[in-house]
Regions:
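Bacterial N-terminal signal peptides
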Residues: 8-20
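Short edge beta-strands and adjacent beta->alpha junctions
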Residues: 409-540
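Extracellular, repeat-based ectodomains that mediate carbohydrate processing or recognition
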Residues: 24-410
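N-terminal secretory signal peptides that target proteins for export/translocation
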Residues: 1-4
Length: 540
């Protein structure tokens, strides 16, 4: 595995061979090795805190009688990644522990999940273990996730809320389920206790439901988006923070009707919008391509599937991964035949928060190109910094390595400013002053045009503290770009008994050149509320 500081991503292994893990920054920077031995090191995954101050990489490592799950942490230090020691995650060492996944909360505390063939039920089981940001285990041993005892529980994924609550999803061939597999979920409190009961995610029970993925959705949903493949289509359903279903039924993601759709991935931004990507086979007469779609709640933000990279004759675009930054931009990576001098290579492409591709695709593996580079994964942190890791098969050496590369998304640079009060409706009437917000009435603030607090005309988003005061009833304030809430909304709830401060909220500004910010208050029974914004940084 190799890494570079502003860009993050992960790959899962397609081949089993003697492996080492490396990481490399983008552009430039030396590669670092995550793990190396004479045994196989495969199936890496990665997670980070919101600020990008600690990255956690997990993978499966071959041992004498099977596989173990290992982890290692990295902290940015002077433009490089400082590595901590690798450590084994599982305490049960018999048999095979495989297919790890990892996710972290706002501060970098993380949860690892994996599949084990040592389940007491006789089939495969799903297990988890929690750690703090320093890599200290919070559980004495792994715990069994599933309540279902019969059948096989496999291919787990995990999503973690900023406050540490988390959801584990997996596929299950429980007796009496669908024809093959169902998608199950279990929610947990931050302390590791179950929240709610084991949930059947899919409402469609005909055919096999498989390959689930999940992402945390912030307010107004305050829950999770789960995606999976089903009989040649990609489906999604939202769950609440305790795992209860929020949508009446599954929703089909893809509008492409020909061929079959598979291998979905999902990522959400801080506004609760979420991007889903997948591979599409046979729709255009060639082998495969990568498609995507973005949603706000249940509403799609692009009416039809977005072609992220159409395949060319006799090539394949496979196994997409996706991550989203604080501005709602998303980065997609995937395996590609034809973009690498030898075999499969890894490429990536940025999509902005209006669902427009930004520039051309970029080849990630520019150092090691021999053999096949496959199965990537991504994580984006504050300032649109990212880290990508993947597996590489080198036939001549009969080995597989894990590599990584880092960089920064276009328009994602973050700049701090001295904390400054930008807007206060308690002040006399003015562009950034009074009057107070009235319930149900939108107000647009020209925050850039006033040239205050060191915010330049080129700013695309602000990092702010939000305070709502003076309301006579409970309610909320929605903050969104001046040219439309569909681009991303921050929701701040308040009550008469206390003001509400949303620390380090990231609010998007309008993209029409005006740099405006809109606010809409909703108050029970009507009335008014005052809004205060203190800015501490901006993106451009």
């Amino acid at each position: 595995v190799k890494a570079r500081i502003p860009f993050a991503g992960i790959l899962l292994p397609a081949f089993l061979a003697a492996a080492s893990l490396h990481s490399q920054a983008l552009p430039g920077g030396s590669e670092i090795q995550v793990a190396a031995s004479a045994t196989y090191q495969v199936a890496p995954a990665i997670a980070s805190d919101a600020a990008g101050t600690v990255y956690t990489v997990v993978w499966q490592k071959q041992i004498a009688d099977g596989w173990d799950i290992y982890a290692r942490q990295y902290t940015p230090s002077g433009g490089t990644l400082a590595a901590g020691p690798e450590f084994r995650v599982n305490t049960l060492t018999a048999g095979c522990q495989q297919l790890p996944a990892v996710a972290a909360d706002f501060n970098g505390n993380f949860v690892v999940v994996w599949q084990s063939d040592q389940d007491p039920g006789g089939g495969t089981g799903v297990y988890a273990r929690r750690y703090n940001r320093a890599g200290t285990a919070l559980d004495a041993a792994e715990f069994r996730v599933h309540a279902t005892a019969a059948g096989n529980q496999a291919r787990p994924a995990v999503a973690v809320a900023p406050d540490g609550r988390f959801l584990v999803v997996w596929q299950s061939d429980q007796p009496g389920g669908s024809q093959g597999w169902d998608i199950l979920a279990q929610a947990y409190n931050a302390g590791g206790t179950t929240a709610g009961v084991e949930t059947l995610v899919n409402s469609l029970t005909a055919g096999a439901q498989s390959s689930p993925r999940a992402a945390y959705l912030s307010a107004p949903t305050a829950g999770f988006a789960v995606v999976w493949e089903s009989a040649g289509a990609v489906l999604t359903r939202r769950l609440g923070i305790t795992g209860a279903t929020l949508d009446a039924a599954d929703r089909q993601v893809n509008t492409t009707a020909t061929g079959f759709q598979r291998s979905p991935a999902v990522a959400a931004d801080p506004s609760g919008n979420y991007a889903i990507v997948w591979e599409s086979w046979g729709a255009d007469g060639s082998t495969s391509r990568v498609l995507g779609r973005r949603f706000q709640g249940v509403s799609p933000l692009n009416a039809t599937d977005l072609t992220i990279d159409a395949s060319v004759a006799a090539t394949q675009q496979r196994n997409p991964a996706v991550s989203s930054d604080t501005l709602g931009n998303w980065l997609v990576s995937w395996d590609s035949l034809g973009d690498d001098p030898s075999g499969a290579g890894l490429v990536a492409r940025q999509i902005d928060n209006r669902q427009n591709p930004v520039g051309a695709k970029v080849v990630l593996n520019n150092t090691l190109t021999a053999g096949d580079q496959t199965l990537s994964g991504l994580t984006l942190t504050q300032g649109s910094r990212l880290l990508a890791v993947w597996q590489s098969l080198t036939p001549a050496a009969d080995s597989a390595v894990i590599e990584a590369r880092s960089g920064t998304l276009a328009g994602g640079d973050f700049y701090t400013v001295q904390p400054c009060r930008l807007l206060d409706t308690r002040n006399p009437s003015g562009p950034l002053g009074g009057p107070a917000l009235s319930s149900g009435s939108q107000r647009v603030f020209p925050v850039v045009a006033q040239s205050l607090c060191g915010i330049p005309a080129t700013a695309k988003a602000l990092s702010v503290n939000v305070t709502a005061v003076g309301a006579a009833a409970v309610g909320s304030v929605n903050l969104y770009p001046g040219d439309g809430p569909a681009l991303g909304t921050v929701v701040v709830n308040f009550s008469p008994s206390r003001s509400t401060i949303a620390d380090n909220a990231h609010v998007l500004l309008s993209r029409d050149g005006s740099g405006n910010l809109a606010a809409l208050a909703t108050i029970t029974g009507g009335g008014q509320v005052h809004l205060i914004l203190d800015v501490n940084g901006y993106y451009q």
